[in-house]
Amino acid sequence: MKISFTGTGCSGKSTLLKKCKDYYGDRFDYVNEVTRPIARKGLPINEDGGDETQRAIIDAHIENNKLDNVIMDRCIVDGYIYTQWLFEKQKVNEETYSYAYSTFNDIIDDLDIIFYCCPLDMEDDGERSINESFQKDIANNMSL
């Protein structure tokens, strides 16, 4: 069973994952983060991301897809939607966009349940983007 939360930054995904951990305990494995470990390696994230960042994120989603009986904070939906936004802003090239798109199509059906989390009021935690326009763009792309 593969379950994931998806949504913009500041939409409650991490809070819901923590609630799942508290409730289900060791009945599932958990993927807490995808993007922040990449940021800790020095790559820019969110609206500042580029080809290297998005490829690393898509690669992480491919690795997470190999897990079974897992609940994840994000999934390939997020990787694709953020890459799509960056492509529209000419921050990633067509090759990176195509990689995200083909990976999305290759692994999306492996997910059993995807919960979409609606955006909440922005809260600065020191890492997430607090750009409300960016959040709205991502939310709009996710609802298409």
Model-found features: residue ranges?
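Walker A (P-loop) ATP-phosphate-binding motif of ABC ATPase nucleotide-binding domains
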Residues: 2
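Hydrophobic anchor at the beta1->P-loop junction of P-loop NTPases
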Residues: 5
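The conserved Walker
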Residues: 9
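Conserved lysine of the Walker
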Residues: 13
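Conserved substrate/cofactor phosphate-moiety recognition/catalytic segment
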Residues: 18-63
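Short loop/turn segments at strand-loop or loop-helix junctions that form parts
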Residues: 33, 73-76, 115-121
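Glycine-rich phosphate-binding loop used to anchor ATP phosphates in small-molecule kinases
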Residues: 52-109
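A glycine- and Lys/Arg-enriched "phosphate-lid" helix/loop adjacent to the NTP-binding pocket
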Residues: 87-142
